[in-house]
Amino acid sequence: MHIKELLSTTRMIPVLTINNLNDTLPLCAALMAGGLSVIEITLRTKPALNAVEMISKELPEINVGVGTLLDPMDLIRAKNSGACFAVSPGLNMDLVEQAQKDNLAYLPGIQTSSEAMTAYRYGLRALKFFPAKAAGGIYGLKQFQPVYPDLEFCPTGGIDFSDAPEYLRERNVLCVGGSFASPSDLIEQQNWKEITRLATMAASL
């Protein structure tokens, strides 16, 4: 599935950091019960790729991606683990080329007009605006609209329930990303019921 098509299926992408592999399936089941089926697992912990493999095998109805990719080997490992999309914090042309070679949906992060222009040249039309709040928030995002009318974004970083609706009203926003539907303290408490409640709220933004 093309990344733009994938992002169009959701209002919010939960960005998850898995510390305990045993939390993976109940956490994802809780998110899915709330209506969120596109999930990003960050490549920041040792269990991350095992978690992706587990999700792809046990919960195939979830579109699981791997985030925090820094080099082509990260992308290759993500695909081999069963990821259906890849996310990076910045724009890396080696990653772009590897994703195209492997036919893996790829969402690179950008902040500036120069980065947007480079992404555009490589045929990328869906981008991650990251870190959204630090990069100017909604005001910063608005600056891309008149210059790049066919670019669309998934703003991520510093977004929560209070400002997500405002981002989603922008015509160049496909969805938002963040951890506000699955806070780390609720994961540590294994409070899946509360995570489902938050996921339901996020899915209806």
Regions from the PLM with identified roles:
Residues 36-41, 79-81, 102, 119-141, ...:
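Glycine/Thr-rich beta-alpha phosphate-binding loop at enzyme active sites
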Residues 32-37, 58-61, 80-86, 100-107, ...:
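Glycine-enriched alpha-helix->loop->beta-strand junction motifs that scaffold or abut catalytic
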